[in-house]
Amino acid sequence: MSFQDLESGRGRSTRKFNGGRQDSTQAVASGIFQINTGVSTFQRLVNTLGTPKDTPELREKLHKTRLHIGQLVKDTSAKLKEASETDHQSGVNPSKKIADAKLARDFQAVLKEFQKAQQTAAERETTYTPFVPQSALPSSYTAGEVDKVPEQRAQLQESKRQELVLLDNEIAFNEAVIEEREQGIQEIHQQIGEVNEIFKDLAVLVNDQGVMIDDIGTHIDNSRAATSQGKSQLVQAAKTQKSNSSLTCLLLVIFGIVLLIVIIVLAA
Amino acid sequence: MAILYALVARGTVVLSEFTATSTNASTIAKQILEKVPGDNDSNVSYSQDRYVFHVKRTDGLTVLCMAEETAGRRIPFAFLEDIHQRFVRTYGRAVHTALAYAMNEEFSRVLSQQIDYYSNDPNADRINRIKGEMNQVRGVMIENIDKVLDRGERLELLVDKTANMQGNTFRFRKQARRFRSNVWWRNCKLTVLLILLLLVIIYIAVAFLCHGPTLPSCI
């Protein structure tokens, strides 16, 4: 019912925009959806055949569901034909053709499923007989009650009193079992609370250690930066030292030449 | 061992029984069979010293067991229900016409197995199994807490070591900068010395060519 309302609402809104082209495609899609739902219900009823729940009412429901699905199949088939006729016209959107082809394949698939379910239903309907509840029993009880005698009435009251005593015992027993079960559940609840506390403590510890790890990361980053700077300083020092060596060598050479000239001059 | 003794009876006729320990349970059980009131279905428990006798009667068949007081009621009555179903499934309508101890040879083994199952197996009771699992979870979580604390201690050590490393690298950078400065100054001094030496040589040469220290010919 609600789906039909939704369908009519959607159809009305769609018609304003597309002028009725998408309406047939949407109708086919919703029809296939309804057939799928009906086939699922039908299969569930078929699975019940042959079980203690198999009753004449179930058979009647099965029959009605089969008729309903048949009607849906007829309607959807007509809509699909209409949509495919529209696709043959010129100027139709190619995506609509693809969508209609997909809907046709879905329709074929759901039809096969329905036929399979129908065969299963036919086999089981012939194999099993519906379970008829014993309707003769209540009438005999009723006949028995009509012949009630004061003695039987007294016995009935005594029986009812004993029944009440037994019910009280049963209630006490069940209450004891329930009490014990509740106690066990309370213990489980308490243990779960303890585990929850442990998880919270663990979260606190892990958060603190996260801070420590951040500190470690900071220290390592600072160390890396300082080491890089120190390395660059040392590289420059190495270059300067190399230059120093060259200058020292040059000085020694010049000093040597000067000494040589002085000695030659003095010797002469 | 939670359940110590079990029997199956029709009225006061014992059909099968099993005792896990040597006690006087059999005698007391037979007295209880005679004492249980009425003929309708019932569930009752009788206390005797540290033990409790649980009795379940269904469809004319009575199942009885003796359990420790600490076993509660849920497990013994689940045991009774199980035994009743197995007995009825195995012997069917023969229950109502059997002689005393007719099924004892076969069924006492079943009683023994089920007594062991309901006494020792945690799966016999869902609540107990969940309790056991929660205990395991709690143990694992406590172990996790210990491991995380140990990890915390190591992380503290690591923080200290990385702080030391940071200090050392800062010192290294400072000394590297100082070393570079020293080397640069030495380079500067050598350059200046070289320039002075060259100037002196040029002066001497020019003085020699100009015939005097005051350069009279050139000026």
Curated annotation (Swiss-Prot), chain A:
The modification N-acetylserine is found at residue 2. The keyword Signal does not apply. The chain crosses the membrane at residues 247-267. Keywords: Acetylation, Coiled coil, Membrane, Protein transport, Transmembrane, Transmembrane helix, Transport, Vacuole. Disruption phenotype: The sgr3-1 mutant has a reduced gravitropic response in inflorescence stem but a normal gravitropic response in hypocotyls. Reduced formation of vacuolar membrane 'bulbs'. CDD domains: SNARE_Qa, SynN. Residues 268 are vesicular. One of its GO terms (biological process) is stomatal movement. Residues 1-23 are annotated as: Disordered. GO terms for cellular component: plant-type vacuole; plant-type vacuole membrane; vacuole. It is a single-pass type IV membrane protein. Residues 2-246 are cytoplasmic. One of its GO terms (molecular function) is SNAP receptor activity. This is Syntaxin-22. It comes from Arabidopsis thaliana.
Swiss-Prot record, chain B:
SMART domains: Longin (SM01270). GO terms for cellular component: plant-type vacuole; plasma membrane; vacuolar membrane. It is a single-pass type IV membrane protein. Residues 126-186 form the v-SNARE coiled-coil homology domain. It is found in: Vacuole membrane; Prevacuolar compartment membrane. Residues 2-189 are cytoplasmic. SUPFAM superfamilies: SNARE fusion complex, SNARE-like. The chain crosses the membrane at residues 190-210. Residues 211-219 are vesicular. One of its GO terms (biological process) is vesicle-mediated transport. The keyword Transmembrane applies. Expressed in flowers, leaves, stems and roots. It holds the Pfam family Synaptobrevin. Keywords: Acetylation, Coiled coil, Membrane, Protein transport, Transmembrane, Transmembrane helix, Transport, Vacuole. Its main location: membrane. Gene3D superfamilies: 1.20.5.110, Longin domain. It comes from the Eukaryota. The modification N-acetylalanine is found at residue 2. Involved in the targeting and/or fusion of transport vesicles to their target membrane. This is Vesicle-associated membrane protein 711. It comes from Arabidopsis thaliana. The gene is VAMP711.
